[in-house]
Design a protein with these regions (language model features):
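Hydrophobic transmembrane alpha-helices and immediately adjacent juxtamembrane helices
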Residues: 1-265
């Protein structure tokens, strides 16, 4: 509880450091911050060409004429956020090692710096997604405001995971590479490129175990199906229960290891 209070107290510092981190990530490159937004657009374009133009994928049997691109970007949007947050935040304590060694600095906020930095790109991507929907003539309904709720959800899930992975990475430096590999495989056990109906029947219950299933499908409920999150009470309770449990585990490990961080930097 004390750590949460200290994080809230230092929220302005978190925001300031996150802005600096976001700018420094592309400092020195000719196009600068443009690269932060170009990369997800290029990735989406590749998947769109492969799955819709090449494989003729139709993910919604009940809506066979619904554009695959719109279905894809609704699922990719939260995934990009989690992927960016995990891959950049796991190594955050090493990257900010010079700060960790300062006894008076609240190192509890360091993992949040990277996640907030990733959230900046996520906000842009949400705007881009809404713009593409409008171009296609799919005007977002009030259900689209639910993306704020689901964004908070993926943010909290990222925080819960990163406290664990960043703490372990200080003592086991291969953790960052392991997380990167896991994230590559994890994309395919969530219905992002393929719909749930396109997976084998035995895999469909397994998909729902992944907390990101709730988030990805939530974005699509907000933009495509127009279904409220309150219409999935069991999934909602399950998701937040997992987040809380993972946060408790992550914070416990982080707190136990924190006194030794500076010694191994």
């Amino acid at each position: 509880m004390n750590s949460l209070k200290s994080i809230i107290k230092d929220r302005k510092m978190i925001l300031r450091l996150a802005k600096n981190d976001f700018k420094n990530k592309f400092a020195g490159s000719y196009f600068g911050l443009i690269w932060a937004f170009v990369q997800p657009v290029v990735i989406v374009s590749i998947y769109w060409i492969v799955f819709e133009k090449g494989l003729r994928s139709r993910p919604l049997p009940e809506m066979p004429d619904f554009p695959y691109l719109l279905w894809l970007i609704a699922g990719m949007c939260p995934w990009f956020f989690l992927n960016d947050a995990m891959n950049t935040s796991t190594n955050c304590l090493i990257e900010y090692g010079y700060i960790v060694k300062k006894m008076k600095f609240n190192i509890d906020i360091i993992p949040l710096i990277k996640i907030v930095s990733a959230a900046f790109v996520h906000c842009f991507f949400i705007v881009l997604v809404l713009a593409i929907y409008i171009v296609y003539g799919k005007i977002p309904t009030p259900y689209a405001f639910q993306m704020i709720y689901y964004s908070i959800g993926v943010f909290c899930f990222s925080v819960a995971l990163v406290y664990l992975t960043s703490a372990i990475n200080v003592f086991f430096r291969d953790m960052a590479q392991i997380v990167g590999i896991i994230m590559q495989y994890a994309m395919w056990v969530i219905p992002i490129m393929l719909s749930e109906s396109q997976y084998p029947a035995f895999m469909r219950p397994i998909l729902k175990i992944n907390p990101m299933y709730y988030i990805v499908e939530g974005y699509r409920d907000s933009l495509i199906r127009h279904i409220g999150f309150w219409e999935h009470p069991l999934q909602t309770v399950y998701f937040w229960a997992v987040v809380i449990i993972m946060f408790i585990i992550g914070r416990t490990v982080f707190t136990k290891m924190k006194p030794h961080f500076a010694d191994v930097m």
